[in-house]
Regions:
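A general structural signal marking secondary-structure boundaries and capping sites
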Residues: 55, 95-102, 139, 164, ...
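Hydrophobic alpha-helical segments that form the core
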Residues: 238-246
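ATP-binding pocket architecture of kinase catalytic cores
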Residues: 9-18, 22-125, 129
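An alpha-helical support segment within catalytic cores of ATP-dependent transferases
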Residues: 99-172, 184, 266
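Juxta-kinase regulatory segment immediately upstream of eukaryotic protein kinase catalytic domains
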Residues: 1-6
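ATP/Mg2+ or Mg2+-diphosphate-binding catalytic cores
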Residues: 248-268
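Short strand-connecting beta-turns/loops that link adjacent beta-strands
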Residues: 23-25, 66, 185-188, 242
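Active-site Asp-x-Gly
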Residues: 121-128, 137, 167-171, 178-238, ...
Length: 268
């Protein structure tokens, strides 16, 4: 592996995930994927750079190359109630950073799926075309969705402006499930895995935080106190999470089909 010649200690945590110690004693976290395109880890490095100016901690990028990335090792600890409150305020601050358009100047990755970030001034069109329909068409082409499913999805996309409030494009993580909120060695919470970062809807980040488990109530209370956001956002979370359910359907197969269809029936 490319980095091994420059480290004093090197160990594998699991396939493609390594911890190492440099000769100067700095601990680093290394991810390697030879099965992904060259921009996979570049997207993560770019995303972490976009997030880095916000109060929420992100790992420093030490090195990135065609098939890997070396990051600051944040360690692993346990977050306190105060840490969660600080993270809520930090995410609110992140979402205060507005962009001129939705998207980003390069494509991203949500898990192992490419994410089209072609900039768009219309958030409803961006979410429909670059998120919902992109994943829906991929699933249909692979035989995971049927014609009726696509008709329902297209109906939803045509009426997004009736079901969701108009929101500005703000800096978002884009893949903000609980697994990407990391408790550092000192308990401080950090955002990791930045490949899906773009300018999008703040509500979409909040919604995904409720998809696979969720932070304590104090996190959301701190967020809502600090942010200018419609506090009824939870009512729209299922619709916003349809993107991630479709993505999981494409990545992991039919076990996610029931969840996708539940949302399609509810909103179509």
């Amino acid at each position: 592996m490319k980095l091994q010649s420059g480290v004093a200690e090197f160990g594998q945590l699991r396939d493609g995930i390594h911890r190492a110690v440099r000769p100067d004693g700095v601990r680093i976290f290394v991810k390697v994927r030879h099965d992904m395109p060259a921009d996979f880890f570049l997207a993560e490095a770019r995303g972490l750079a976009v997030l880095s100016s916000a109060p929420l901690r992100v790992p420093d990028v030490i090195s990135v190359w065609e098939h890997g990335i070396a990051l600051e090792d944040l360690g692993r600890g346990r977050a306190s109630a105060r840490d969660w409150e600080n993270a809520g305020r930090g995410l609110a601050d992140l979402h205060c950073s507005a962009g001129e358009r939705f998207g980003l100047d390069s494509r991203g990755w949500c898990g192992d799926s490419t994410q089209d970030n072609t900039p768009d001034e219309d958030g409803f069109h961006f979410f429909a075309e670059r998120r919902l329909l992109a994943q829906g068409r991929r699933a249909f082409d692979r035989g995971l969705l049927e014609h009726d499913d696509m008709r329902q999805l297209e109906s939803i996309c045509a009426r997004l402006c009736e079901m969701l409030p108009k929101q500005p494009p703000v800096r978002v993580h884009g893949d903000l499930w609980m697994g990407n909120v990391h408790a550092c060695a000192n308990g401080e919470l950090a955002l990791i895995d930045g490949g899906a970062v773009h300018y999008g809807w703040a509500e979409a980040d909040l919604a995904m935080l409720t998809l696979f488990g969720e932070p304590p109530a104090s996190f959301f209370c701190a967020y809502e106190t600090a942010a200018k956001i419609d506090k009824t956002w939870r009512k729209r979370a299922a619709l916003l999470n349809l993107y991630h359910l479709l993505n999981h359907l494409n990545l992991f197969g039919a076990s996610y089909l029931g969840g996708v269809r539940t949302v399609l029936r509810r909103y179509s």
